[in-house]
């Protein structure tokens, strides 16, 4: 199926343009199934869980293929029986059943809703992604005419003040972004997006190895089996529609978004519907989202850059993008700029011009983009970040030097954000995108091998659920600070953070290294970090009397 160029679509067609894509790629890119049923069939079904209430609300749209009433006295409806069954996915053990009767209208779709209790439900979490199978059987004149099944999980995702909660407990999101629609433009994409083992390594194995529990599906959805993998192995998702720049009439947008919720709404991994990327749309934010919230009340909605200022009580969360280094792209006089606006890389207490809103907001703040320091897979700076690398490394930096700077920079920015405990989640940009584009991902060489760049090594540490960071500006990457005096005292804080629901304690070993990597002093600092908390641990180092470079 080929639609043609993006510009040929009619004005009412819902969807947007992505200004970081080059081509419009229409056509079928997910599985298509042909099913054989009777004349009354399940068109759509949602199994919406409530772990707290130990029940599942099942919403169905039943499609009748019988012809409409043609003559006076002809049937307008048919009496049917609907059997609902819930089973454990792995064992097949039936945990609950219910039967209702209804009358689907002929040549139409009819809505039915029922609630099914579950005794002792097993919760779905990233650490224990337990799945159930929901089944709907349709009987017409006591004859089975359709059977429809989906997987789902028993989990409650909500918010409490500025924080997300999973199954009633505070939950911090840690992870990255997937821009699959951009990756489709990559000359090395080929059939990788439909290779289950490749996708599992990308979406499950690598993220879990570096302490990620979340991913944002960014500027366009992915094939259904990607969501299945996240359901099965435990990665939570912010699922974003194809919306950056506006396109489409309101009624068509309603149709597309409503179908989206029905289509993807059974996946327990999807905990946030992301309606817009970096934009504002009053119809979506204040009319459509409240309407769709009634269809699916089990998830949170994000409306791009819209906040409580535009949405009032409809605002459930915000998505700030603290790209602190963006100025390096726009300023032609970087040295003068940084004299007035120094960027103290490594100083975790450092403020940022856009940080005040994050601190003052009353809803969860999910930083789902940051890290304006992209490279292509061959180690060259991307289109947007050439000036970054030229400023810090010079114009002749090697790929290895660029990768090491990128990795270290991302570590320190991650530490900076995680140190602000009112931020409810941190998703770096970007885990997968098209090569040779405006941005970049953190793989090197051939993408089919998913060979990690040095950034992954640092991510493992800065994304650890319990971690300790050094709150100290790195003098190697600043031009506005004078060297410290040999033999002086250096006072700073260690910052301990804990995303877990239990107290974490241990000892921190602090070493001072010379330029050859030799330890010239060492001290131990005991530290205790409360659950979901932060601990500042003051430290004092006596600097060497010999001038030189130290770490």
Please place each PLM-identified region on the residue numbering.
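Secreted/periplasmic carbohydrate-active enzymes, especially glycoside hydrolases
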Residues: 1-217, 237, 256-259, 271-272, ...
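Substrate-binding/catalytic cleft of secreted carbohydrate-active enzymes
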Residues: 199-202, 214-447
């Amino acid at each position: 199926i080929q639609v043609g160029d993006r510009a040929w679509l009619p004005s009412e067609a819902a969807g947007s343009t992505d200004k970081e894509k080059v081509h419009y790629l229409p056509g079928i890119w997910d599985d298509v199934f042909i099913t054989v049923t009777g004349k009354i069939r399940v068109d759509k079904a949602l199994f919406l869980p409530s772990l707290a209430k130990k029940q599942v609300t099942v919403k169905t749209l039943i499609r009748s293929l019988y012809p409409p009433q043609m003559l006076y006295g002809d049937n307008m409806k048919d009496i049917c029986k609907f059997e609902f069954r819930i089973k454990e996915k792995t064992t097949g053990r039936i945990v609950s059943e219910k039967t209702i009767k209804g009358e689907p209208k002929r040549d139409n779709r009819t809505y039915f809703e029922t609630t099914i209790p579950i005794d002792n439900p097993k919760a779905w979490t990233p650490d224990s992604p337990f799945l159930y199978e929901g089944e709907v059987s349709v009987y017409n004149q006591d004859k089975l005419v359709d059977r429809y099944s989906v997987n789902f999980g028993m989990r409650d995702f909500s918010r409490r003040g500025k924080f997300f909660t999973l199954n009633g407990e505070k939950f911090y999101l840690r992870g990255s972004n997937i821009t699959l629609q951009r990756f489709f433009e990559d000359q090395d994409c080929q059939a990788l997006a439909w290779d289950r083992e490749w996708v599992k390594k990308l979406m499950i194995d690598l993220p879990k190895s570096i302490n990620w529990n979340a991913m944002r599906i960014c500027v366009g959805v992915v094939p259904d089996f990607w969501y299945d993998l996240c359901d099965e192995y435990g990665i939570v998702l912010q699922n974003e529609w194809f919306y950056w720049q506006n396109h489409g009439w309101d009624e068509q947008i309603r149709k597309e978004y409503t179908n989206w919720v029905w289509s993807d709404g059974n996946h327990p991994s999807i905990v946030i519907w992301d309606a817009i990327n970096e934009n504002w749309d009053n119809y979506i934010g204040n009319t459509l989202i409240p309407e769709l919230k009634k269809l699916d009340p089990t998830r949170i909605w994000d409306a791009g850059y819209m906040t409580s200022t535009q949405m009032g009580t409809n605002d459930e969360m915000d998505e700030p993008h603290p790209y602190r280094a963006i100025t390096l792209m726009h300023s032609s006089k970087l040295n003068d700029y940084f004299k007035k606006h120094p960027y103290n890389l490594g100083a975790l207490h450092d403020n940022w011009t856009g940080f005040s809103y994050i601190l003052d907001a009353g809803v969860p703040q999910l930083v789902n983009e940051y890290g304006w320091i992209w490279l292509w897979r061959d180690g060259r700076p991307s289109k947007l970040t050439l000036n970054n690398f030229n400023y810090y490394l010079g114009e002749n930096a090697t790929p290895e030097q660029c990768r090491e700077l990128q990795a270290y920079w991302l570590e320190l920015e991650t530490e900076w954000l995680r140190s602000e405990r009112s931020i409810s989640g941190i998703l770096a940009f970007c885990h997968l995108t098209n090569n040779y584009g405006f941005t970049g991902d953190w793989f090197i060489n051939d993408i089919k091998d998913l060979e990690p760049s040095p950034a992954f090594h640092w991510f493992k540490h800065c994304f650890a659920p319990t971690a300790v960071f050094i709150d100290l500006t790195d003098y190697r990457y600043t031009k506005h600070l004078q060297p410290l005096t040999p033999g002086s005292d250096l006072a700073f804080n260690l910052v301990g953070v804990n995303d877990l629901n239990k107290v974490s304690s241990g000892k921190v070993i602090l070493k001072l290294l010379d330029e050859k990597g030799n330890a010239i002093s060492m001290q131990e600092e005991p530290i205790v970090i409360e659950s979901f908390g932060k601990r500042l641990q003051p430290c004092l180092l006596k600097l060497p009397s010999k001038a030189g470079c130290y770490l």
